[in-house]
Amino acid sequence: MPRLAMNVQYASEWDSLPNEKQFRKWARAALRVDTEATLRIVDEEEGRMLNRDYRGKDYATNVLTFPLEEEPWLVGDIILCAPVVAREAAEQNITLESHYAHLTVHGILHMHGYDHEDEHQAELMESIESFTMIQLGYPDPYSSEKRKR
């Protein structure tokens, strides 16, 4: 089983944030290789600044991933924007815990090189996310979208 070294930083005092043990459990479930990650929970201002500075998009997004190194361990940062995650969970009528789990898995997969830039890549990444979420005991985050395709 791949090893995980994870530092969780709470830079946002948002309500109902998962604890470090939960984040580590979700990240471990998606690991493919030994990984060292920093997972940072941010407010909307920091999320917007990071998205603007690194992606050229002037809004806060739910998750950003910054892979930094590949050898000998995969190293990178995952940023979760607490207000955006909470808003999306409410809009999608899903639990906040489930949405945090999904976005943590999603971020780890991005660190591992998975992407959703074209339909084939998106289908592969989504299938891994769906499998991982079900293994963790959560609903398939794409089940309603798959029915629409």
From Swiss-Prot:
Q: Which organism is it from?
A: Methylobacillus flagellatus (strain ATCC 51484 / DSM 6875 / VKM B-1610 / KT)
Write down the Pfam families for this protein, in alphabetical order: YbeY
Coiled coil stretches, renumbered: none
> Which family would the database say this protein is a member of?
Belongs to the endoribonuclease YbeY family.
Which InterPro entries has this protein been placed in?
Answer: MetalPrtase_cat_dom_sf_prd, YbeY
Q: Name one GO cellular component term.
A: cytoplasm
What's the protein called, per UniProt?
Answer: Endoribonuclease YbeY
Give the protein's biological function: Single strand-specific metallo-endoribonuclease involved in late-stage 70S ribosome quality control and in maturation of the 3' terminus of the 16S rRNA.
Quote the subcellular location field of this record. Cytoplasm
| Cofactor: how and how many bound | Binds 1 zinc ion.
Q: What class of enzyme is it?
A: hydrolase
What this protein needs as a cofactor is:
Zn(2+)
Q: Which residues are listed for Zn(2+) binding in this entry?
A: 106, 110, 116
Tagged with keyword Aminoacyl-tRNA synthetase: no
The EC code for this enzyme is 3.1.-.-
